Regions:
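Residues within the DNA-recognition helix of helix-turn-helix
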Residues: 62
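N-terminal helix-turn-helix DNA-binding core of bacterial DNA-binding proteins
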Residues: 12-55, 70, 77-89
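Regular, well-ordered alpha-helical segments
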Residues: 24, 68, 99-102
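Residues in the helix-turn-helix
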Residues: 58
C-alpha cells in the first residue's frame, strides 16, 4: 500500500482487534514461537519449548495468551497438543516482518 492510499479512518473500526494482536506479539518469546509456527506449520508443545528455549510451563502461558487473541489454535493427539497459526493474516504479518527486518539488504532508513 502506498502512503498516499493510507486511510486511518478505515483502521478505526478494527483498532481494538489490531491492538490486541500487537499486544499479544509484543514479546520476544511470543514472536519466536509464532515464527516457528509459521516455519513449521504445526508443532508440539515439547518441540516448540525446545526451539524457543522455554520450559513447557512458561510456553503454555505464552500459548494461552496467543490462543485468547485467536492467533494460535491446537489439536490434541493422544496426550500431545499440536499448535498452529489460527489466522492467515498472522502468517502474512510475519512474512511482512521478515521482509522488513530479516532480509539482509533491508536497512533502517
Amino acid at each position: 500500500m502506498a502512503v498516499k492510499d493510507f486511510k486511518p479512518s478505515i483502521l478505526e473500526a478494527q483498532a481494538a482487534e489490531v491492538a490486541g494482536v500487537l499486544r499479544a506479539i509484543a514479546n520476544e518469546r511470543r514472536l519466536m514461537i509464532l515464527c516457528k509456527l509459521v516455519e513449521w506449520r504445526e508443532a508440539s508443545v515439547s518441540s516448540l519449548a525446545d526451539a524457543v528455549g522455554l520450559s513447557q510451563s512458561a510456553l503454555s502461558q505464552h500459548l494461552a495468551k496467543m490462543r485468547s487473541e485467536g492467533l494460535v489454535a491446537y489439536r490434541r493427539e493422544s496426550q500431545t497438543l499440536w499448535y498452529r497459526i489460527a489466522d492467515a493474516r498472522i502468517e502474512r504479518l510475519f512474512a511482512t516482518l521478515h521482509r522488513l527486518f530479516c532480509v539482509t539488504n533491508n536497512k533502517r532508513r
